């Protein structure tokens, strides 16, 4: 006799099945599906294929809604990023933004797709421009 499962949840699906599904999703849909639950987020990030061509980021004059434009397909995506409030982009490479807070001059790395933040130690030197080097690891 079959055992009836009460209140099944999408979070209970095997991660191998979620991996197959998410590996076929466009980046935008992968990000959306990754928001469902922690297990889906982990699988989504592991199979996420970031586009090989650069995207354009338009910074708002006010507020936290940033526009990302895929120049190859000319598609526009809007993303709320309160983490970047009052920040300036100093440099970008391989999906990472090197940011500086206007008010405190704190410097940090930010990945707009994963929303990972890496805070850097305070720098006592006065500087006008900064950059970073990162070899591309495959």
From Swiss-Prot:
Gene3D superfamilies in alphabetical order: 1.20.1280.50
Region forming the signal peptide: none
Pfam family, one: Beta-prop_KIB1-4
Residues annotated as domain F-box: 7-53
CDD domains: F-box_SF
Record-linked PANTHER family: OS09G0392200 PROTEIN, REGULATION PROTEIN, PUTATIVE-RELATED
Record-given protein name: F-box protein At4g12382
């Amino acid at each position: 006799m079959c055992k009836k499962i009460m209140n099944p949840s999408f979070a209970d699906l095997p991660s191998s099945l979620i991996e197959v599904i998410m590996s076929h999703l466009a980046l935008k849909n992968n990000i959306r599906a990754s928001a469902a639950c922690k297990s889906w987020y982990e699988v989504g990030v592991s199979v996420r294929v970031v586009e090989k061509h650069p995207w354009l980021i338009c910074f708002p004059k006010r507020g936290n809604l940033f526009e990302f434009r895929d120049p190859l397909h000319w598609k526009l995506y809007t993303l709320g990023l309160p983490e970047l409030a009052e920040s300036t982009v100093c440099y970008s490479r391989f999906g990472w933004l090197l940011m500086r807070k206007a008010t405190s001059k704190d410097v940090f790395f930010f990945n707009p797709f994963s929303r990972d933040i890496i805070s850097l130690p305070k720098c006592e030197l006065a500087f006008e421009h900064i950059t970073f080097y990162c070899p591309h690891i495959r």
